[in-house]
């Protein structure tokens, strides 16, 4: 069957987009600590999008972080999983996947927060896109073992499933974590992998035959 525009593959390139993304995130973090209003401009705040039409926040929220440890944990995850995924699928595919899943996770979360009345919620961080990257890593390397906290061995698919349940039940608690963004990142990651890459994650994980 001839490829459509949805699943047409890019020519393989490797320009280390992972490092570029990390650098951008670090630069933004430095700037937002110099210009104190910048986090509210870049973060996704539903009331600003609704009333001020700041639609760029659907994209920019994933480059803004609340503090150093938030930035460090996300960039560490991106460094660990991102480079391997990028080398496997190519830089262009990697960037499209990362930016698209992150943006769609932001848009979906916006409508869910709007529906729930949480319009003053401030959403920021690369976690939605990072969850999608972890998902793709687990699909490409289903037998890979990840050491949680550096000591607990766990197969990559098990880790992703564990994170899913943590965020699913975590959304019912007011703990300041954007669980909806995490879950949306996983959802759009699954759709991207299934529709564009024509890979069934459950088959890759050995759950389905």
What are the roles of these predicted feature ranges?
Residues 1-209:
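A detector for small-residue-rich transmembrane helices and their helix-helix packing motifs
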């Amino acid at each position: 069957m001839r490829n459509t525009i949805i699943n047409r593959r890019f020519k393989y390139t490797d320009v280390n987009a992972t490092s570029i993304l990390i650098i951008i995130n670090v630069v933004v973090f430095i700037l937002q600590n110099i210009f104190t209003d910048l986090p509210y401009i870049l973060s996704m705040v539903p009331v600003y999008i609704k009333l001020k039409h700041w639609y760029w926040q659907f994209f920019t929220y994933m480059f803004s972080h609340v503090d150093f440890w938030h930035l460090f944990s996300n960039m560490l995850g991106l460094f660990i999983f991102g480079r391997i995924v990028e080398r496997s699928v190519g830089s262009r595919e990697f960037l499209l996947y990362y930016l698209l899943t992150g943006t769609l996770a932001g848009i979906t979360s916006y409508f869910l927060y709007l529906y729930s009345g949480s319009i003053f919620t401030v959403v920021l961080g690369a976690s939605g896109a990072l969850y999608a990257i972890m998902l793709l890593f687990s699909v490409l390397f289903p037998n890979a073992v990840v050491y949680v906290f550096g000591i607990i061995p766990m197969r990559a698919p098990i880790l992703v499933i564990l994170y899913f349940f943590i965020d699913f039940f975590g959304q019912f608690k007011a703990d300041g974590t954007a669980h909806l963004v995490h879950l949306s990142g996983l959802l759009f990651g699954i759709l991207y992998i299934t529709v564009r890459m024509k890979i069934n994650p459950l088959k890759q994980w050995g759950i389905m035959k």
